[in-house]
Amino acid sequence: MELPILPTSVIGSYPKPRWLLRMYKLRELGKIPEEDFKEAVRDASISVLREHERAGIDIPWDGEMGRSEMTEYFTSKIKGFKFYGPVRVWGNAYFNKAAAVDKLEYEEPLVLDEFLWVKENTTREIVKIPITGPYTIAEWSFNEYYPDKESFVMDLAEIINKELKVLEKHGAKFVQLDEPAMLNHPSEVPLAVDAINRAVKGIKMKVGLHVCYSNYNLLADYFDEIKVTQFALEFANRNFRDMDFLKKLSNKELGFGVVDVHNPRVESVEEIRQAIKKVFTYLEPEWVYINPDCGLKLLDRKIAYQKLVNMVQAVRGVRKELEKEGKTTIEFRTLKDI
């Protein structure tokens, strides 16, 4: 399978329509039937998909319209977790932090329904399914059952592995493990790496790993060891500085973050075009995908959309330059190719 060179994608989240946020609130208060809420989520999913497609994104997703939060969504579906109530993340932001109170078990698919709905309603051949990784789920949950963190994390890795196999069986081509917490404790990075590798054991499709702004020099020490196809990382947030760690990346792709998801200023097409060209100092264009730094959900929806539009326009400009060198397409690599 071939894709245009410098394929464009998203990381995961996208601003929810205001009417969907109202439905979330009504659901929380028990004032609407669950079927009404699910219908609203499906409608929002299609709306965001169309927005991504209209922006020109090659590999879209639905912006996680059915997910209230990136760990809560998964822990609510895994047997053995219990919720005690919300905890503060920052400012006035809260999430329901789960506690493992029994052995964790895979009872039902976690994101299969999401994937099948998106697959059915997109015009694109490939979508990217974001899944919160085992280490981050453990790090952002309480442990009231397991004797140590390793057994907690590795049981979650087994569960994610089962989910990936279900998705692959139903035609998924590209999943992305989100591990924003994996570099929090340098001494535990080997555990996070082992968990990722266990989660992808026996998987053949394309697997990306997204790690938010952090110490990428530490991550780079494990580039070869981590069994994924692609690393999706933030660069706009650091003004494209300190990129020398990319010299350690070989035979794996880079998802190059080119728009800042924390800044409402919309980067110009020319700014993004120049940023893209910087990465060619380290990697051949055939090994680069283009995406935002991270999920876009904290931005105003119009701003998020315009950032995607400008990102795609910048990519198209660089593609025209690469076309003069005979570079127009790339192979869609999977774990089998790495």
Swiss-Prot record:
Pathway participation:
Amino-acid biosynthesis; L-methionine biosynthesis via de novo pathway
Name of the top EC class for this enzyme: transferase
- Top-level lineage group: Archaea
EC code(s) of this entry: 2.1.1.-
Designated name of the protein: Methionine synthase
Gene Ontology MF term list: 5-methyltetrahydropteroyltriglutamate-homocysteine S-methyltransferase activity; zinc ion binding
Query: Which N-terminal residues, if any, form the signal peptide?
Result: none
Q: Which family does it belong to?
A: Belongs to the archaeal MetE family.
Q: Does the record bear RNA-binding in its keywords?
A: no
Report any one BP term from Gene Ontology: methylation
Where is Zn(2+) annotated to bind?
210, 212, 234, 294
Q: How is the cofactor bound?
A: Binds 1 zinc ion per subunit.
Q: Cross-referenced Gene3D superfamilies, in alphabetical order?
A: 3.20.20.210
| Function in brief | Catalyzes the transfer of a methyl group to L-homocysteine resulting in methionine formation. The physiological methyl donor is unknown.
Query: What cofactor does this one take?
Result: Zn(2+)
Q: Which PANTHER family match?
A: 5-METHYLTETRAHYDROPTEROYLTRIGLUTAMATE--HOMOCYSTEINE METHYLTRANSFERASE (PTHR30519)
Keyword tags: Amino-acid biosynthesis, Metal-binding, Methionine biosynthesis, Methyltransferase, Transferase, Zinc
